[in-house]
Design a protein with these regions (language model features):
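Conserved thiamine diphosphate
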Residues: 1-116
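Short helix-loop-beta junction
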Residues: 116-124
């Protein structure tokens, strides 16, 4: 609306998707709802690399960013490669991340379902 003349650097973090020990009305996915808002960037990390890189990128972004976290991923341990711990490590918002390359099928997922997709890729 401002033609790029104004910035709104703010980060919103929130739980999204299926959760443990809550009613069905509390386990909805807001990714498409937020994603349909013009100018609002939405990220949904899966592993430690995504969390660190995307949250740092969100904090540095001049536009509003929503970070959608799956509660069931809290407490899940991932190995952190050395490059992830580098102080300059960030993941570019808006660019797809390829977790596993293949030649027969493309599987697209976000958040918790990335893990399930990688399992499915092994079977396929």
């Amino acid at each position: 609306m401002s033609g790029g003349d104004l910035t709104c650097p703010i980060v919103f973090r929130g739980i999204n998707g299926v959760c443990a020990s809550v009613g069905a009305q509390h386990t909805q996915c807001f990714a498409s709802w937020y994603g349909s808002v013009p100018g609002l960037k939405v990220v949904s990390p899966w592993n430690v690399e995504d969390c660190r890189g995307l949250i740092k990128a969100a904090i540095r972004d001049d536009d509003p960013v929503v970070v959608l976290e799956n509660e069931m991923m809290y407490g899940v341990e991932f190995d952190a490669p050395a490059h992830v711990m580098d102080k300059d490590f960030v993941i570019e918002i808006g660019k797809a991340k390829i977790e596993r390359e293949g030649t027969d099928v493309t599987i697209v997922a976000h958040a918790k379902m990335v893990g399930r997709s990688l399992e499915a890729a092994e079977v396929l």
